[in-house]
Amino acid sequence: LGDKANGNSQYGVTIGDRASTGKGANAIAIGLMAKTSNEKVGGNSQTAVGVASYADGEGASAFGATANATGALATAVGRNSKALEKSASAFGDSASASAWGATALGVGSSAKADNSIAVGSQAVTEGRESTALGRRSYAGAQSATALGTGANASAIVSTAVGNGAKASEVGASALGNTAEASGRGSMAFGYASKASAVDALATGSNANASSMNAV
């Protein structure tokens, strides 16, 4: 239904000028140039709703102008959102989930690694099973966790909790606004605390532990 609409899906629905459904069964394309396909990923039951939205893959769903869901069970919701792998989910304007099972929620959020979760405006995950929660938060290695505005956990199993907190070595933990843990296995607890040596522990506001095993 619509000028130059092209419906190829068995039991499918095609509504909108130049909207099109591929050969997969039960596909739905609604909106100007909305498109479902099974050319790249294959499968049935794709859904694309919105101007130039696109869905390809078994059960893939794209909602919003230029939303793109490419992967089995991928879900993209929001203008220019992208879910580009199996079971990936992207919610929000320009949100992007580009790895298997990844989840991105928030304007410009980006989940780039398998099973990672990025929540918040411009939050980013780049490590497998990592978590970033908060505006501009960043989790850059496997199992890293960053919680808070601008929190940054860039090493394997590192943890940064608090606005501007940073954990930059393997197993390091920084808890508190602007706390920094930059030694392997180090821990910094408290506002602006710093632990910069291996296994160092800094506890309290502005505390500083700069030698190995220091407390």
Describe the role of every protein-language-model region:
Residues 1-215:
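Glycine- and small/polar-enriched repetitive beta-structure motifs of secreted/surface proteins
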